[in-house]
A protein has these predicted regions:
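N-terminal helicase ATP-binding lobe
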Residues: 1-558
């Protein structure tokens, strides 16, 4: 497409010019009229008469030092005009800021913000509500729901919650009234029968959108939502590719899988150490391998670390293990983020990444990138996949460019750089392929959605299963079915039945013969708790810890 027919391509041309200028402020002053015409008002600032006039009218209600760009103003206006709105725009657009701008400007009484992760709950609270506390002082902030607590819906409330917490039957009824509902990352509403979380998010939307006087759904890279007229309140769709920063992808070919580690090391060494850099790994094991084979060989930087980090390192060495990968990373100026790291430890690392100049490199898996808006100049994609290293688990173009979009931040970087380490079997990605049409499962043909709506009688296998458990469909939805698909529940039940037989047999063996060892019983119980088959190592460790002469965790793990 020619640039004159593609405003974003023109924007990128001018952003690159600012980035390459010896004096970007002087160059912005020279280009002020062009920048203003392209809606790059954040760069034209007060360098032209039109910009000065515009900024007076576009001043943020939250922060008078910020002027909203024209498309942000449009979004706030569309939210106000429509009972329901779906907004698709790049990560750097500033969608979340628009939401809080609307809240401050129009003051809806009961606000519910639904986000994918607890990390985002914390981010919204710290970076916006706490930072601009004078603007939200009349709101009571809730980051969890308590069935025993009485909430006053006649006063001003903001609930910031994960969808897991609101979809449960009891929690859903706690929220009596919603004046303004926002659900983030709604591309995850797209039908995926293999994913239980898709069902959870769809039901959160289904229940809460009916209660809400007004709602907004947020996502990147969505071209359209199929059957949008079937959704609650027939939402208005606003799609934009506006971005005030440029995301570049640089491809670094490798010939063999084992070259990924050395290439990542080489790229990282070539980058400015003062720039924030994310290093993405598809699995926790590949991350830990990089730490043990590359980072562990780097010199320690203990004399540069503050006392809080040093205290944590000493505590972790004593209570966990001196060779824990996190300790190895911290001592050398790296942070790590994955689902195996305790939540509190993840949170304090994110704070250091955002606020400290000592920690500019963060190793992560998809647990971070799906749930936190970090600031990064660079990202190294060591392999374009998640969960697995197998070729069949490659990223889609949507996944890939959603990752790339995590680089570059307004007021910090004109250009964000993604470094793609590509083997011969890895895909080529085109940005045009990332923009997709989706259909929410709640409007699709779905057995699980029917069950959630109480339409159980349609399915004989469901009816028979409820009879076997001797429970009503209401009991099923309240206590079992709110977080899992029916097929998942059946698999869990069958595993439970099998483990129950084994457990009772082992208990009977203990009753009949007191000399029977405890290890087999520990193995069965651990399998039940962790839903894993291979548990020999863990069972031996637990059995040791349960012995009368208790050893420390560190000694037991040896």
């Amino acid at each position: 497409m020619k640039q004159q027919n593609n405003p974003q391509a023109l924007r990128e041309k001018y952003i690159r010019e600012l980035n390459g200028a010896n004096n970007s402020a002087l160059r912005a002053k020279e280009l002020a009229d062009d920048l203003f015409s392209l809606d790059l008002t954040v760069y034209s600032q007060n360098f032209s008469f039109r910009s000065i006039v515009y900024n007076l009218f576009a001043m943020s209600e939250i922060d008078e030092n910020i002027s909203m760009h024209p498309e942000q103003l449009q979004i706030v206006s569309k939210i106000n005009e429509n009972a329901a709105t779906i907004i698709s725009a790049p990560t750097s657009f500033g969608k979340t800021f628009c939401i809080f701008e609307y809240i401050v400007k129009y003051k809806p009484k009961n606000v519910v913000l639904i986000v994918p992760t607890l990390a985002l709950v914390d981010e919204y609270f710290k970076k916006i509500i706490k930072k601009y506390k004078n603007k939200f002082s009349h709101y009571k902030i809730h980051t969890s729901l308590n069935e025993e607590k009485i909430y006053d819906f006649n006063s001003f409330n903001i609930f910031i919650l994960t969808h897991d917490r609101v979809v449960q039957e009891t929690n859903y009824h706690i929220i009596e009234k919603i004046d303004f509902l926002v659900i983030d990352e709604v591309y995850k509403l797209e039908t995926d029968m293999q994913n239980d979380r898709v069902l959870v998010l769809n039901m959160a939307y289904y229940y809460l959108s009916k209660k809400a006087s007004k709602y907004v759904l947020l996502a990147p890279f969505i071209k359209e939502v199929n059957d949008i007229d079937k959704l609650e309140k027939s939402p208005f769709f606003y799609g934009s590719n506006y971005s005030p920063v440029v995301n570049d992808v640089r491809t670094f070919p490798i010939l063999q899988e084992q070259d990924r580690v050395s290439e990542c090391k080489r790229i990282l060494k070539s980058l400015n150490e003062e720039e924030k850099t994310l290093i993405y790994f598809p699995t926790v094991s590949s991350m830990y391998k990089y730490i043990s084979t590359v980072i562990a060989l780097e010199p320690k930087k203990l004399k540069f670390l503050d006392h809080e980090v040093l205290f944590f390192i000493e505590w972790a060495k004593e209570e966990i293990h001196e060779e824990w990968c996190l300790i190895t990373a911290l001592e050398r100026g790296y942070l790590i983020h994955n689902g195996q790291i305790p939540m509190g430890t993840r949170m304090f690392q994110l704070d250091y990444y955002e606020q400290s100049n000592l920690f500019n490199k963060l190793l992560c898996t998809s647990t971070l990138l799906e749930g936190v808006n970090t600031t990064a100049k660079n990202i190294i994609i060591t392999k374009p996949s998640r969960i697995s290293n197998s070729p069949g688990d490659h990223f889609s173009a949507f996944d890939f460019f959603n990752l790339v979009g995590r680089t570059g931040r307004l007021h910090q970087h004109y250009i964000g750089d993604a470094y793609y380490i590509k083997s011969p079997s890895d895909p080529e990605y085109r940005k045009a392929d990332a923009v997709k049409s989706i259909r929410f499962e709640v409007t699709d043909a779905s057995k699980d959605i029917d069950i959630q709506k109480g339409e159980v009688e349609k399915y004989q296998d469901v009816v028979e299963f409820l009879k076997k458990l001797n429970i009503t469909k209401e009991d099923y939805l309240a206590n079992i079915g709110s977080k899992a698909r029916f097929d998942t529940v059946i698999d869990l039940y069958n595993a439970y039945a099998m483990n129950k037989i084994k457990l009772l047999a082992q208990l009977q063996a203990h009753i009949e013969d007191g000399r029977v060892g405890r290890l087999r019983l520990v193995e069965i119980l651990y399998k039940i708790c962790e839903q894993k088959e291979k548990v020999k190592l863990e069972s031996n460790l637990i059995n040791t810890l349960l012995s009368k002469k208790k050893a420390s965790y560190k000694k037991s793990s040896r």
